[in-house]
Structure formats: structure tokens, C-alpha cells
């Protein structure tokens, strides 16, 4: 277990860097988690983060890659609902990284 430290909070993470307590998530935590992944959040990132949190609220699980891309396509259109777009924002393991930054558990079927 590790911890995410800042002047504003001290939050426990699992061994892969996911929040142990989902209720501890907020936008400041997201910025710190993104920083740990070498990502500087832009409005494009926040759009996906909000969407993945909406998916979690609806289905009670973080989406794996294919489900994430399909959901983005449905909600934001075909320009953004492509693997290349989401990977450009969150890297090669986009579903895992986006879920982590969004304060959600690791998606099922993600190695």
C-alpha cells in the first residue's frame, strides 16, 4: 500500500496506485494522480474523466477498453470515440489510467 501526499490531503492507494476509498476522490486528487502518470490534465482529459465516472455511477464498474471507447463514441461522438483519441490522452493503457485518475477501481479484464 502506498500513499498520495499533498498539502491538502494524505490518501491511501493500493499497490497499483488506485484509491482504496473511492469517496476520497476530488479534482485535486485527480490532478495528483495524473501527475504520477506524467499527465497534465486538459479539458479534453476532464471530459473523459467525467464520462468514465458517469459510466461507473450507472454500471458500478469502471469500463475496460472496448466499453470505454464505445461509451465515449455514444456520448461524445465518433471523433472522440476512437482508441487513438483516448490513448493520446491517457497512454497505451488508457482505460486503466483514466480509471485511476478518475478515482475508480481498476477495470475488469485489464492486465
Question: What is each stretch, according to the model?
Answer:
Residues 18-24, 58-61, 72-73, 84:
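A short, ordered amphipathic alpha-helix with a cationic face
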Residues 13, 67, 73-111:
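Helix-rich interaction surfaces within compact, conserved domain-sized segments
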Residues 30, 34-53, 57-58, 65, ...:
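Metallocofactor- and cofactor-centric catalytic cores in central/energy metabolism, strongly enriched
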Residues 5-40:
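N-terminal first-folded block
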Residues 53-60, 78, 87:
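Amphipathic alpha-helical interaction elements
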Amino acid at each position: 500500500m502506498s500513499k498520495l501526499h499533498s498539502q491538502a490531503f494524505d490518501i491511501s492507494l493500493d499497490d497499483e496506485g488506485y484509491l482504496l476509498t473511492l469517496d476520497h476522490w476530488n479534482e485535486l486528487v485527480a490532478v495528483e494522480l495524473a501527475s504520477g502518470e506524467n499527465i497534465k490534465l486538459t479539458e479534453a482529459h476532464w471530459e473523459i474523466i467525467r464520462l468514465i465516472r458517469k459510466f461507473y455511477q450507472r454500471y458500478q464498474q469502471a469500463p475496460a477498453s472496448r466499453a470505454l471507447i464505445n461509451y465515449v463514441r455514444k456520448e461524445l461522438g465518433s471523433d472522440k470515440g476512437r482508441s487513438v483519441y483516448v490513448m493520446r490522452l491517457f497512454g497505451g493503457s488508457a482505460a486503466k489510467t483514466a480509471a485511476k485518475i478518475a478515482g475508480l477501481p481498476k477495470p475488469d479484464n485489464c492486465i
